[in-house]
Regions:
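Glycine-rich oxoanion-binding loops at beta->alpha junctions
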Residues: 55, 64-95
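N-terminal amphipathic/basic leader segments beginning at the initiator methionine
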Residues: 1-47, 198-201
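Short glycine/serine/threonine-rich phosphate/pyrophosphate-binding segments
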Residues: 56-59, 83-86, 107-113, 136-139
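Short glycine-rich or small-residue beta-strand-to-loop segments that form or flank ligand, phosphate
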Residues: 2, 45-52, 68-71, 97-106, ...
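Short, acidic/small-residue loops that bind anionic groups at enzyme active sites
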Residues: 71-76, 120-145
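Gly-rich Lys/Arg/Thr-decorated short loops/hinges at beta-loop-alpha junctions or inter-strand turns
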Residues: 42-50, 59-72, 136-139
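Gly/Ser/Thr-rich loops at beta-strand to alpha-helix junctions
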Residues: 52-57, 103-111, 147-152
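Internal, active-site/partner-interface "lid" segment
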Residues: 137-146, 156-201
Length: 201
């Protein structure tokens, strides 16, 4: 495996800042993640996505015109904190409310949910749409327990397109939910992941 990093402990932060440095015309670093460096329409919905680092180009690579307005990035394979989510969402807010969308994982549900409560307390309308596309993680009778993996992209893109069109927060939520309802995926890995600084598995 090819490795491009300095200190393994600094890998997520260096990857984030490196991506921003390479794409200053599109991205801006904020505490906890990245937001668009370009202007969005005033009073439009901001779509904020996120999750653990290590699944590149997700999540920062999904920020830009026609995609998300911001991405929250936790540590490697770890949910971002509620403070990180709150910070990125505040920076991405255009005045039309915020849609938080992410894969259905316990840590993400907890932390994004807490951040949503803080945003609402600040007077910022905020809704959540979980991505639940992974058919291997739960049976059809337990759709709400399915994880979100590759289907993230479909849901994020649909929500972002609705926001770009000027739809309201409620309408963007409905578009995202419908995209999630229509999306299924099945992941296959040929070998295990390799963490920075760890020996190949």
């Amino acid at each position: 495996m090819t490795r491009l990093f300095n200190d393994p402990n600094d890998f997520p932060e260096e990857a984030r800042l490196g991506l921003v440095a390479a794409h200053r015309d599109k991205l801006m670093a904020v505490p906890g993640g990245v937001v668009r460096s370009t202007r969005s329409q005033p009073d439009s919905v901001a779509v904020v996505v996120g999750g653990g680092s290590g699944h590149y180009p997700t999540f920062a690579g999904l920020v830009g015109q026609g995609l998300a307005h911001g991405a929250v990035m936790g540590n490697l394979f770890c949910s971002p904190s509620a403070q990180q989510v709150y910070s990125v969402a505040k920076a991405a807010n255009n005045g039309g409310g915020v849609l938080l969308s992410f894969g259905n994982y316990a840590g993400d549900v907890l932390h994004f949910g807490e951040a949503r409560e803080r945003l609402i307390a600040d007077g910022i309308p905020c809704e959540i749409v979980l991505v639940t596309d992974d058919v291997a993680s739960a049976p059809l009778a337990e759709l709400d327990k399915r994880r979100g993996i590759a289907g993230d992209l479909t849901v994020f893109k649909a929500a972002a397109a609705a926001a770009e069109k000027g739809l309201s927060l409620e309408e963007v939520v409905q578009v995202a939910k419908e995209a999630n309802r229509c999306t299924r995926s099945f992941g296959v890995a040929f070998e295990g992941c390799t963490l920075p600084g760890a020996a190949d598995s």
